[in-house]
C-alpha cells in the first residue's frame, strides 16, 4: 500500500549564491552526508547539495508533514549503494522508502515513495 508520494524540483544554480553557505549546509546535511559532500568539487558539490535538499523536500511531502516542527533535514539521511543507487537510510517512517534522483545541467528532480503503514 502506498502511504505517500512526494516530488520536488530544485534549481542547482541557487546553491551557488547562498548568502551563508556554511550555516545552510549544516542545517541540510547530516554529519555523514557532510563528509561525503566535502569530497566533492565544483559542479558535482552543488549537484550533491541540491540533490540531498530536494530528496528531503520530497520525503517530507510524501510523509505528509513538510519540513518544520515535526520533521527536519537532520531526520533524513541519504546514502548510496555500491553502484550509486540512492537510498534513504535514516528516516521516521516505519515502512519501505523508494527514492529517485535525476540531474540536468541546472536542475535536480527527486521523487520519494513511502510504502506500507506508519
UniProtKB/Swiss-Prot annotation:
Mainly localized where? cytoplasm
Q: Name one GO biological process term.
A: fatty acid biosynthetic process
What InterPro entries does this protein map onto?
4-PPantetheinyl_Trfase_dom, 4-PPantetheinyl_Trfase_dom_sf, ACPS, P-Pant_transferase_sf, Ppantetheine-prot_Trfase_dom
What cofactor does this one take? Mg(2+)
Alphabetized, the UniProt keywords read: Cytoplasm, Fatty acid biosynthesis, Fatty acid metabolism, Lipid biosynthesis, Lipid metabolism, Magnesium, Metal-binding, Transferase
EC number(s) on file: 2.7.8.7
Please give the Pfam families that the UniProt record associates with this protein.
ACPS
Q: Where in the cell is it found?
A: Cytoplasm
Signal peptide positions on this chain: none
| GO molecular function annotation | holo-[acyl-carrier-protein] synthase activity; magnesium ion binding
The UniProt annotation places Mg(2+) binding at: 8, 57
Catalytic activity reads: apo-[ACP] + CoA = holo-[ACP] + adenosine 3',5'-bisphosphate + H(+)
* One GO cellular component, as annotated: cytosol
Q: What job does this protein perform?
A: Transfers the 4'-phosphopantetheine moiety from coenzyme A to a Ser of acyl-carrier-protein.
Read off the HAMAP family from this record.
AcpS
Q: Which NCBIfam families match?
A: acpS, pantethn_trn
Say which family it is in. Answer: Belongs to the P-Pant transferase superfamily. AcpS family.
PANTHER family from the xrefs? L-AMINOADIPATE-SEMIALDEHYDE DEHYDROGENASE-PHOSPHOPANTETHEINYL TRANSFERASE (PTHR12215:SF10), PHOSPHOPANTETHEINE TRANSFERASE (PTHR12215)
What is the protein name for this chain?
A: Holo-[acyl-carrier-protein] synthase
Q: Which organism is it from?
A: Pediococcus pentosaceus (strain ATCC 25745 / CCUG 21536 / LMG 10740 / 183-1w)
Amino acid at each position: 500500500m502506498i502511504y505517500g508520494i512526494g516530488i520536488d524540483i530544485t534549481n542547482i544554480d541557487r546553491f551557488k549564491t547562498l548568502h551563508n553557505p556554511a550555516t545552510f549546509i549544516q542545517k541540510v546535511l547530516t554529519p555523514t552526508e557532510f563528509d561525503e559532500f566535502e569530497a566533492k568539487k565544483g559542479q558535482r558539490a552543488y549537484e550533491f547539495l541540491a540533490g540531498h535538499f530536494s530528496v528531503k523536500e520530497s520525503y517530507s511531502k510524501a510523509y505528509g508533514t513538510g519540513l518544520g516542527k515535526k520533521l527536519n533535514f537532520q531526520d533524513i539521511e541519504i546514502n548510496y549503494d555500491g553502484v550509486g543507487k540512492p537510498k534513504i537510510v535514516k528516516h521516521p517512517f516505519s515502512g519501505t522508502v523508494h527514492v529517485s534522483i535525476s540531474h540536468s545541467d541546472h536542475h535536480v528532480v527527486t521523487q520519494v515513495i513511502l510504502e506500507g503503514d506508519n
